[in-house]
Regions:
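A conserved regulatory-domain signal marking ACT and ACT-like small-molecule sensing domains
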Residues: 1-80
Length: 80
């Protein structure tokens, strides 16, 4: 099963690398990525697939929300 995360964050040096690194370390594969940026804020959309059934996208969203630059994380189902 795939999930989609939409992450709103403050555009800062290294922010995208930190978020993607956390996603991969927590056992998810990035299947798609899109980003939009305006001045000092940005939005990152990640299509994810867990590497095993034990991985929870809800826990991942909480962990991403703890990063300094992250303002909001929304979970949505992967479109069919």
């Amino acid at each position: 099963m795939r999930d989609r995360l939409v992450i709103d964050f403050a555009a800062a040096e290294g922010a995208v690398v930190r978020m993607i690194g956390l996603v991969e370390r927590r056992g998810f594969r990035v299947c798609g990525i899109a980003m939009a940026e305006e001045e000092e804020k940005a939005s990152l959309t990640l299509d994810l697939q867990p590497l095993d059934a034990k991985r929870s996208v809800d826990v991942l969203a909480l962990q991403l929300g703890r990063l300094h630059e992250v303002r909001n994380v929304a979970i949505s189902g992967f479109p069919s």
